[in-house]
A protein has these predicted regions:
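Bacterial N-terminal signal peptides
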Residues: 1-7
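Sec/Tat signal peptide C-region and signal peptidase I cleavage site
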Residues: 8-14
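N-terminal small/polar-rich segments of proteins
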Residues: 14-133, 140-192
Length: 192
């Protein structure tokens, strides 16, 4: 019995040396979060009513609205910068359409080591490149592309500036809302 105990004591001390290694594990969950800072944008044209018979409703300054798009993305695909944010609209008022441009200057100025690989505005939406405003439809359109693991910061002034403009495209389909508002939905989807 004594011999067994002595042998065990020597085998335990034989595992130690002047260099020791330890295995560690790191677990990070993949995540994809997108947020538009203003949850609701209202295009109020009640002050744009014509004052002279025979004059049309002409959309005034309220036809232009802005907000910011923020996101956080942790890729699950080995670091390929293939994340995207797409945009679509449903239930837009008949007789109208909405256009969108995006400005990514602020996001492009962020430190890559701190914020990660932020995406670029797709060229057809890029306000900084002189793009024409894109008409939003019910079909997803890529707005931000080449997103790596990154985050934009949270709130107004962070991320990407979104610039909406409302347009009349068929006057015959317009109708008065009598104080209520027609509701449409703009959907942003982040994916990799």
């Amino acid at each position: 019995m004594v011999a067994v105990a002595t042998s065990f004591a020597f085998s335990v001390s034989a595992q130690d040396s002047e260099v020791e290694t330890q295995t560690i594990g790191v677990v990070i969950d993949a995540h994809a979060l997108v947020d538009v800072v203003a949850d609701e944008i209202v295009f109020d044209f009640s002050a744009d009513d014509p004052v002279e018979a025979g004059s049309p409703l002409v959309l005034g300054a309220n036809k232009n609205q802005t907000t910011h798009l923020n996101y956080s993305l942790m890729l699950s695909n080995g670091g390929l910068a293939d994340g995207t944010i797409s945009v679509r609209i449903t239930d837009m008022n008949e007789g109208m359409h909405l256009t969108l441009l995006a400005d990514g200057k602020y996001a492009a100025s962020l430190d890559r080591d701190k914020y990660g690989l932020l995406g670029t505005v797709a060229s057809n939406f890029d306000a900084t490149q002189g793009a024409n405003p894109v008409i939003l439809t019910a079909t997803d359109q890529i707005l931000i592309e080449n997103i790596g693991s990154s985050y934009t910061g949270n709130g107004s002034g962070n991320g990407y500036l979104l610039q909406y403009t409302a347009h009349i495209n068929d006057y015959s389909k317009l109708d008065a809302d009598n104080g209520a508002q027609d509701m449409g939905t703009i959907t942003y989807t982040i994916a990799e």
